[in-house]
Structure formats: C-alpha cells, structure tokens
C-alpha cells in the first residue's frame, strides 16, 4: 500500500469513527505505543481538521510491562500519557497491525488498570486475519490481508508512508 492509498485508508477510518462517535464528548482515542501512535496521531489530527469544533480526548498507552513476552526480550518502556479519566468513557484503541492479538490483550490489561471504560473498540490499520492466537477482532479495519506465518507486515511511517508485506525467510 503506497502513501496515497495509506492516507485514503486512514481518512476512511477517521470518517467511520466520526460516524459512530461524533461529537466525541464521551469518547477518547488512545494509541498503543509504539507503532499505533503515528496512526492515532494522523486520525485525531484529521478529525480535528474537518471538525474544528470537536475536542478529542487523546492519549498514548505503553504496554511494555503487560506483554506476555516481557521476560524474553529487552523492551524499553515508553510513557503512558492519559491526561483524562477513561471511567465511563467509550475508548477507541488504535494500533498498526493486528496479528496474534497478544498486543491488544496487553493493551486491554494496561487500559483496565487506568479505570473502567463504558466500551472499548479496536481500530486497526492492517488486519492479518488468519493468524489470531486470541479471540480478538477489530471494530474498524483499514485493510484486511491474508498472510502466512512466514510473511511479515511492516508499516513505514517516515518520509515515505506505506505498508509492506514481505517474506521473512
């Protein structure tokens, strides 16, 4: 997926969130660190560009200490930045790629340590739908792909923005 298609997909996801959550008075958007931040930044900024009257509660969630592979790898924690209460709110978690579901499970654990949300929805840029190890399904999907275990999906968010599917062997 090249940059034009990627931006179009992110704008579509933004419009889906607007359709279901406008005016965002009881909704907060939370990006999962590290790779969900660029996507949640884009979506939040785009919504506020087309609806400047809207104030979105926006935060960033670090899941380092909630991962089930924490002891097996070296992870440098980031800072969780939730400058609002999620108590009774509708929360939209945003990440780049949904693969096994383990990152989302860790995000749910981290989120619940910050309060009890009324509802939690999941917004994903790329859904690798046949690789799930946990019963987790997204509510908003940018692109759904069929991939095998030896393939990887990488979201590049620098000067060139794109999604790459490649073989890892």
PLM feature spans:
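Internal catalytic-core helix/loop-beta-alpha segment
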Residues: 82-112
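Short, glycine/charge-rich flexible loops or terminal/linker lids adjacent to PRPP-binding catalytic cores
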Residues: 53-91
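Charged, well-structured alpha/beta interaction segments
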Residues: 24-45, 101
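PRPP-dependent phosphoribosyltransferase catalytic core
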Residues: 109-169
């Amino acid at each position: 997926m090249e940059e034009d298609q990627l931006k179009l997909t992110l704008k579509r996801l933004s419009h889906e969130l607007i359709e279901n959550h406008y005016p965002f008075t009881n909704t907060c958007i939370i990006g999962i660190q590290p790779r969900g931040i660029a996507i949640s930044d884009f979506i939040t900024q785009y919504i506020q560009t087309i609806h400047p009257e809207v104030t979105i509660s926006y935060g960033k969630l670090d899941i380092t200490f909630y991962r089930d592979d924490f002891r097996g790898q070296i992870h440098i924690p980031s800072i969780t930045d939730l400058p609002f209460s999620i108590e009774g709110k509708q929360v939209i978690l945003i990440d780049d790629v949904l693969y096994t579901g383990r990152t989302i499970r860790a995000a749910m654990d981290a989120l619940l340590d910050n309060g009890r949300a009324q509802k939690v929805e999941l917004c994903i840029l790329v859904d690798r739908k046949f690789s799930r190890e946990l019963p987790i399904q997204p509510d908003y999907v940018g692109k759904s792909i069929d991939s095998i275990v030896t393939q990887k999906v990488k979201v590049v968010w620098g000067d060139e923005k794109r999604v790459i599917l490649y073989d890892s062997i």
